[in-house]
């Protein structure tokens, strides 16, 4: 086997494990962001980081043929929350610039976005479980493909 084919095989065999890892890490990270915001630590970049990870996980999950279609539910719900967040931010800025305090938009955003994100978290865990059931030997397959690729790379 040549190096290029080994690299393609490594990519293909490690994809389920990478996707599984992302589908576990993303909801844990979202929960940590929730907890940090309850403590009073708000950082605007967390949402962007989560969005990027969700995008990559969704692209990788779409290439997993053995997993059911509900693997797309959690990322789509996160896209919806990001889009609604932008719309609600515009509403907040509009209300504040009109002389209001912004409380209506903030209350509306918490009533809409939080349940959607909680449902997305649940679907991330459900999808991770589906990936684990569809690819029971994914970790071993990824390690074996990585070792084979590294051996070929060292030999050349």
Where are these regions (language model features)?
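Physicochemical signature of membrane-embedded alpha-helices that form the seven-helix bundle of GPCRs
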Residues: 21-25, 46-49, 74-84, 105-112, ...
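Membrane-helix interface and helix-disruption motif detector
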Residues: 34-52, 94-109
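Cytosolic juxtamembrane helix at the C-terminal end of the final transmembrane segment
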Residues: 58-66, 119-152
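Generic alpha-helical transmembrane segments
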Residues: 32, 39-62, 80-88, 116-117
């Amino acid at each position: 086997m040549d190096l290029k084919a080994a690299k393609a095989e490594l990519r293909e065999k490690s994809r389920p494990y990478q996707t599984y890892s992302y589908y576990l890490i993303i909801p844990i990270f979202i929960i940590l962001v929730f907890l940090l915001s309850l403590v009073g630590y708000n950082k605007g970049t967390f949402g962007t980081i989560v969005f990027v990870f969700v995008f990559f996980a969704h692209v990788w999950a779409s290439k997993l043929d053995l997993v059911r279609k509900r693997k797309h539910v959690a990322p789509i719900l996160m896209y919806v929350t990001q889009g609604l967040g932008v719309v609600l931010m515009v509403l907040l800025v509009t209300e504040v610039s009109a002389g209001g305090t912004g409380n209506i938009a903030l209350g509306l955003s918490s009533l809409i976005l939080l349940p959607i994100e909680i449902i997305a978290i649940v679907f991330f865990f459900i999808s991770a479980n589906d990936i684990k059931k569809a690819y029971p030997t994914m970790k071993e397959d990824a390690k074996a493909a990585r070792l084979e690729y590294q051996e070929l790379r060292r030999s050349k």
